[in-house]
Amino acid sequence: MNLNINSDISKAETLPSSFYKDLESFKIIKNKIFLRAWHWVGDENLIAEKNSLYPFTLLEGFLDEPLLLSRSTDNNIKCLSNVCTHRGNLLLLKPCKSAKIRCMYHGRRFKSDGKFEFMPDFEKTKNFPRNCDNLNSFLVKSWNKLLFTAFNPIVDIEKVLDIMDKRIGFLPLNKAIFDSSLSQNFKIDAHWALYCDNYLEGFHVPFVHKDLSEVLDYNSYETEIYDHCNLQIGYSNKKEDCFIFPKNHIDYGKNIAAYYFWIFPNIMFNFYPWGISINVVKPINLKFTEVKFRSYVFDKTKLNKGASSDLNKVEKEDEFVVQNVQKGINSAFYKSGRYSATKEKGVHHFHYLLSKFLNS
């Protein structure tokens, strides 16, 4: 499917309804976008000690890529393929501590950095070992103890994190602790991009989120667009339950209750005075999506206040409208719409990037 989203939002039309129903586009997105995206995979506590090994599946049910986080004796963190280079067996099935990675199938052994080390009964095998006998090693970025990985990224993660740091660098994120009580997975009967569409605009807040709209100043709501990320700034009607900025901060003197950062294509970082809620949107099929919420808290006294007073309620309200849109786009009479040039900058940005990389 060839998509053409005009770069001028005042002239552009939204993604056609056919995009959300096209299986071929869904498959192409996997290879052209998700396999080339940066992915948030957790935090350093997954491999807190030296010689820690942590196997996981990246975007299970969609990418289904077996990976392995490794922390060596010199505290070097790696993200490796969890697939043995001999016959394709999964190397590890559960977290463990070991200075070596050993395949349980035929005994092939690797160092913690993924380099091939030993294979029994291969003395007569010619031209062995080769570079391809090492485990594939992927890019890793640690930011405030949060871990990201990528294979062949189209996004410059350093630029994105620098943009985020300019706004939230003053927060003690390195002291934030994972809170399982505020973390869960949501299953939504809708296309993954519809969920992102909804997240990327505050236009719907007065109509869908009555309680949240009493906290946020709708008329002051802002969206800032960058290359591969964007930021929505949630201003408050009052000073209570807002960030306390240092004097040299770009937003010093403003009543800001939340920063909502989105990284193309599917990661949301929601910053509040108490900490951060990270949302990862995982496509499953054309009509089903899973969204992972993970929260890290550095100030419990500020929980359940302001713009984050009831995140679960807001999520359910969002799911309700997104699932209604999923039903609506199946209409034979809806093709596409237009953007509000002032209120839907984030949605347009998302659609433009999708079209850019799908057409590349």
Functional labels for PLM-detected ranges:
Residues 41, 91, 116, 212, ...:
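Short clusters of hydrophobic/aromatic residues that line enzyme substrate/ligand-binding pockets
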Residues 76, 82, 141, 146-360:
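C-terminal catalytic domain of Rieske-type non-heme iron oxygenases
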Residues 1-19, 176-178:
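Short, contiguous pre-domain boundary segments
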Residues 34-38, 89, 204:
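Generic structural signal for secondary-structure transition and capping sites
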Residues 17-62, 68:
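Non-catalytic accessory segments flanking enzyme active sites
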Residues 47-153, 158, 165:
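Rieske [2Fe-2S] iron-sulfur-binding domain
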Residues 36-41, 48-50, 119-124, 261-265:
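Short Pro/Gly-enriched beta-strand edge/turn motifs at strand-loop
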